[in-house]
């Protein structure tokens, strides 16, 4: 029951009167003209009708930078115009997200993991398809909570060569590859596989994986996720040839370039019919090996198809320091291994990528500087940068 209290009402009326008087006093003292210190900002008219301009369409110089944030629960993809070194947009992603670009550059796909209580609680895995120009979400597809959560490896998820499907790797409770139908915007099936890793798509609904014995095994699949394992290739590297976790692979050409911790370069050309292994070669001379030159970083290799040039991030370093940043890029012929040039980046770099146009950019990402540096890939000259890119960016992606 509410009791009427005249004293409380009188107090409330007095407080209201005091507040009104105070506001009137402030209004009387308010300036009637805009302070000159505000300049043009103070006289800019307000906009009643606001329109959103469309974003820039993707081109050969477009680059996407992934900031995994040192295993933070939320991550970011930065869309950057490599022509002018301008930030075009940002896409929020989940823990250890994978990013995949369509072959025509019109959309990109992210696979994500989030939790109901930020860093704990119920896990939720999903896939988003995002328009590359507007950055609008075109599809949000739920998938089983089985993404392999590890330091981001580009080939733990991939688009099919025709952009119709997305494939992602599951490690536990058993090895499998998940199939997502992007056209129907739906998850299809988890396909059981042997103990193999990394996904390298080829045409006609087929892909290869790298298996523990050092071979590549091919798998075909149909629209319902029925998997057809095929005969594995020969073992192409020895047990002591420790391969980096982020090789270069082109969905369009099937070219695979895979360096080891010591600088040996393995290569192959993958098709839906066969695999042609190329003769491996050494990146460093014997004198350079004695001086402790080794590849290092997180995304250490790139390849320019038309120029047939391999780019490897490297520095003088102690053994087993292969994930630490490097300052130099060695550029070699993709067939013979002949040294073409060495680029001093002038920064500690964690990952590199190269555009595929006639005048290519070399992109170099530094987690420490939180910056994408742009270089002329031929001359090695630094031409620009974009800084303040999150917590610890390590990976960049360009159109295939």
From Swiss-Prot:
GO terms for biological process: methylamine metabolic process. Its main location: periplasm. GO terms for cellular component: periplasmic space. It catalyses: 2 oxidized [amicyanin] + methylamine + H2O = 2 reduced [amicyanin] + formaldehyde + NH4(+) + 2 H(+). SUPFAM superfamilies: YVTN repeat-like/Quinoprotein amine dehydrogenase. It is found in: Periplasm. Transmembrane segments: none annotated. Residues 1-27 form the signal peptide. Methylamine dehydrogenase carries out the oxidation of methylamine. Electrons are passed from methylamine dehydrogenase to amicyanin. NCBIfam families: TTQ_MADH_Hv (TIGR02658). Belongs to the aromatic amine dehydrogenase heavy chain family. This is Methylamine dehydrogenase heavy chain. It comes from Methylobacillus flagellatus (strain ATCC 51484 / DSM 6875 / VKM B-1610 / KT). The lineage of its organism: Bacteria, Pseudomonadati, Pseudomonadota, Betaproteobacteria, Nitrosomonadales. The gene is mauB.
């Amino acid at each position: 029951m509410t009791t009427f209290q005249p004293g409380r009402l009188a107090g409330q009326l007095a407080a209201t009167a005091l507040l009104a008087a105070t506001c009137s006093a402030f209004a009387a003292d308010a300036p009637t003209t805009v302070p000159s210190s505000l300049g043009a900002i103070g006289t800019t008219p307000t906009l009643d009708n606001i329109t959103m301009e469309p974003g820039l369409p993707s081109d050969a110089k477009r680059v996407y930078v992934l900031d995994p944030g040192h295993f933070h629960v939320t991550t970011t993809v930065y869309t950057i115009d490599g022509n002018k070194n301008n930030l075009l947009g940002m896409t929020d992603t989940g823990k250890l997200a994978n990013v995949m670009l369509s072959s025509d550059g019109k959309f990109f796909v992210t696979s994500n993991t989030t939790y109901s209580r930020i860093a704990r609680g119920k896990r939720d895995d999903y896939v988003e398809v995002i328009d590359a120009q507007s950055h609008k979400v075109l599809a949000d597809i739920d998938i089983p909570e089985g993404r392999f959560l590890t330091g981001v490896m580009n080939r733990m998820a991939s688009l099919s060569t025709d952009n119709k499907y997305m494939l992602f790797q599951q490690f536990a409770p058993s090895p499998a590859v998940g199939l997502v139908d992007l056209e129907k915007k739906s998850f299809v099936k988890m396909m059981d596989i042997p103990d193999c890793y990394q996904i390298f798509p080829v045409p006609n609904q087929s892909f290869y994986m790298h298996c523990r014995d050092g071979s590549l095994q091919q798998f075909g699949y149909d629209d319902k996720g029925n998997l057809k394992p095929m005969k594995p290739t020969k073992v192409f590297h020895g047990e002591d040839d420790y391969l980096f976790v982020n090789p270069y692979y082109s969905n369009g050409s099937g070219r695979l370039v895979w360096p080891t911790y010591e600088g040996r370069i393995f290569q192959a050309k993958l098709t839906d019919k066969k695999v042609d292994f190329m003769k491996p070669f050494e990146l460093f001379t014997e004198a350079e090996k004695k001086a402790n030159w080794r590849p290092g970083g997180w995304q250490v290799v790139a390849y320019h198809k038309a120029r047939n040039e391999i780019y490897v991030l490297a520095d003088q370093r102690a053994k087993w320091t292969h994930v630490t940043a490097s300052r130099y890029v060695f550029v070699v012929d993709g067939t013979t291994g002949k040294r073409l040039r060495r680029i001093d980046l002038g920064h500690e770099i964690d990952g590199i990528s190269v555009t595929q146009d006639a005048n290519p950019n070399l992109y170099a990402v530094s987690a420490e500087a939180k910056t994408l540096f742009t270089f002329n890939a031929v001359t090695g000259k630094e031409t620009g940068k974009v800084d303040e890119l999150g917590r610890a960016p390590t990976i960049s992606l360009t159109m295939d």
